[in-house]
């Protein structure tokens, strides 16, 4: 019975662990080649890569011991590695988008519009404060004029 499960499980290990590992290595090379910054979120990526290699090694080192506990252990290892892989793929995609020129252009435009909005607000506040000063100066002047000497 265990001999029938083994090739299917090894195929699952190959496609769901080894292929994402290759994708990560490509993305990591791409990110390190085209950015000036060290990406700290790649540290858990290194751990998940090591974890993936451990799972692959575990699948090859215990081929004859096919009891239910080892199958369950390997299943959970694959599941945890998949969850880590999707999380890291999302993180790396976000970093790639942030570092891209298109995102930088969008951010610069947003900064420009934000600066112009703040300048307009500052001008409006300055006009309002000038009007209030003039009004208060006129009131003070009128009060001073009315006082008998």
Swiss-Prot record:
Please tell me whether the keyword Transmembrane helix is annotated for this protein: yes
Domain of life assignment: Bacteria
- Localization annotation: Cell membrane
GO cellular component entries: plasma membrane
Sorted alphabetically, the keyword list is: Cell membrane, Membrane, Transmembrane, Transmembrane helix
> Mostly located where?
membrane
Membrane topology listed for this record = Multi-pass membrane protein
Membrane-crossing residues? Answer: 12-32, 42-62, 69-89
Keyword set includes Transmembrane: yes
Q: Which NCBIfam families match?
A: MPN565 (NF045757)
Q: What is this protein called?
A: Uncharacterized protein MG384.1
Q: Which organism is it from?
A: Mycoplasma genitalium (strain ATCC 33530 / DSM 19775 / NCTC 10195 / G37)
């Amino acid at each position: 019975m265990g001999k029938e499960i083994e090739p299917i499980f090894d195929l699952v290990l190959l496609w769901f662990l080894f292929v994402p590992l290759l994708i990560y290595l490509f993305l990591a090379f791409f990110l390190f080649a085209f950015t000036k910054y060290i990406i700290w979120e790649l540290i858990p990526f290194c751990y998940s890569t090591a974890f993936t290699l451990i799972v692959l090694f575990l699948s090859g080192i215990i081929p004859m011991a096919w009891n239910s506990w080892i199958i369950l252990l390997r299943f959970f290892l694959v599941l945890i590695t998949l969850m880590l892989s999707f999380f890291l793929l999302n993180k790396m995609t976000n970093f790639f988008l942030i570092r891209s020129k298109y995102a930088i252009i969008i951010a610069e435009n947003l900064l420009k519009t934000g600066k112009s909005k703040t300048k307009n607000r500052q001008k409006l506040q300055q006009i309002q404060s000038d009007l209030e000063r003039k009004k208060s100066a006129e009131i003070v002047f009128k009060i001073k004029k009315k006082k008998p000497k």
